[in-house]
């Protein structure tokens, strides 16, 4: 059994009362009372509808919620679903909750869920974000079925996003992960995914979670482990993805968890990614699900202002991170008006690669490097919004592919500057 120390006596007792299962659905929560009820109901309905013969358990690991989240998970009644759907499970659906800390620790939470799946000998372990407000019961089937029927080890989602959603994924996480690790996974940092029992067990035993990038970005670390370890990976079309509104715009924290984890992963995986050229398609299962378009209102002038202010105020920091030519070009476009402004794809790609190399070399404090990247990302996001505001979604896909091609084409530039000292 992997990582026995993750299982407290109380947690272990609850798991032993369940016995072996086929499917574990993990929920890592922290003050999610406003959304957790519908999420649990959708999970229960998905198990009833799609896996009535399978033994299943919902396992909630809670990071110190003060709003009754854990109680809502364990008290969720499946009786109402039985009566409404007229579909009955042929096995008991278990639901347990354990508090692991007073503050959230996503890396520890993931390891605890995987340790539970390992102990229960689950064939599939599904992770669902507790604030996924658009989840429907069919998500379970779309994520789990490829593991059951086609022996895949990791199923990553492909979300149908509104036009201007997922800018960080489209402009940085996807193209860079694709160019670095050579796999076209559209959502490398997904909070909803399914892993085989093999992946869960191996993740616990390979020490990734003890590395900086494993602690910062546990979800993307599972993806990277899978693509570098030659596990069988596919992608499932799950439909729309939306989160409950957040106090969100702490973009520094978001980028630290995502971009910081990706940059950090390059250190320990250099021998792997430095030998990769181009990228390979990853199988996609399921059918596209239509989603009604929504009009998003964005303050473009404010975005330009944040970009220009960041370039000006952070000049000494940027000078230590970026080449003189890239910094000069950023200063030039920062002086442009809203109608003339453009942050070209090639300039953005070089910017990202120079930040990655400086992060590797720890030119300055790594957190400060990520913070300095935030206003530049806002500038690139402004160009993304401007380019796509009037066109159809097909144009966005074409531009996404073009940006990925730039990242792949310029990867030798990253290798060239990787070991240089500024």
Predicted regions and their residues:
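N-proximal low-complexity "stem/linker" segments adjacent to membrane-targeting elements
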Residues: 1-45, 402, 412, 419-422
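Terminal low-complexity segments of carbohydrate-biosynthetic enzymes
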Residues: 259-422
């Amino acid at each position: 059994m992997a990582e026995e120390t993750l299982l407290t006596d109380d947690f272990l007792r609850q798991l032993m009362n369940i016995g072996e299962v086929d499917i574990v659905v993990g929920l890592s929560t922290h003050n999610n009372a406003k959304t957790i009820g519908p999420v649990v109901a959708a999970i229960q309905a998905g198990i009833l509808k799609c896996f009535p013969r399978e033994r299943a358990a919902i396992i909630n690991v809670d990071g110190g919620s003060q709003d009754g989240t854990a109680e809502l998970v364990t008290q969720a009644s499946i009786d109402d679903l039985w009566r409404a759907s007229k579909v009955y499970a042929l096995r008991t659906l278990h639901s347990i909750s354990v508090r692991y800390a007073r503050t959230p620790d996503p890396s520890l939470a993931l390891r605890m869920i995987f340790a539970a799946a390992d102990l229960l000998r689950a064939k599939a372990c599904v992770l669902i974000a507790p604030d996924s407000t658009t989840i429907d019961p069919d998500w379970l089937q779309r994520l789990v079925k490829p593991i059951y029927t086609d022996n895949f080890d990791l199923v990553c989602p492909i979300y149908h996003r509104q036009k201007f959603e997922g800018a960080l994924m489209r402009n940085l996480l996807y193209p860079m992960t694709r160019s670095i690790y050579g796999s076209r996974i559209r959502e490398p940092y997904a909070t909803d995914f399914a892993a085989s029992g093999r992946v869960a067990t191996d993740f616990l035993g390979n020490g990734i979670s003890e590395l900086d990038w494993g602690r910062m970005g546990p979800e993307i670390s599972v993806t990277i482990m899978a693509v570098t370890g030659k596990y069988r990976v596919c992608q499932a079309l799950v439909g729309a993805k939306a989160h409950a509104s957040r106090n969100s715009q702490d973009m520094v924290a978001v980028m630290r968890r995502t971009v910081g984890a990706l940059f950090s992963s390059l250190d320990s995986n250099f021998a792997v990614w430095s030998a990769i050229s181009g990228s390979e398609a990853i199988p996609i299962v399921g059918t596209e699900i239509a989603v009604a378009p929504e009009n998003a209102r964005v303050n473009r002038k404010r975005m330009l202002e944040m970009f220009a202010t960041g370039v000006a105020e952070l000049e000494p920091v940027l000078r230590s991170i970026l080449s003189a030519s890239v910094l000069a070009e950023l200063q030039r476009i920062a002086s442009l008006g809203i109608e003339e402004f453009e942050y070209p794809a090639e300039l953005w790609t070089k910017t990202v690669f120079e930040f990655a190399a400086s992060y590797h070399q720890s030119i300055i404090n790594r957190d400060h490097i990520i913070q300095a990247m935030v206003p530049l990302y806002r500038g690139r996001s402004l160009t993304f919004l401007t380019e796509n505001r009037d066109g159809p979604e097909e144009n966005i896909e074409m531009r996404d592919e073009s940006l990925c091609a730039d990242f792949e084409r310029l990867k030798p530039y990253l290798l060239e500057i990787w070991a240089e000292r500024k």
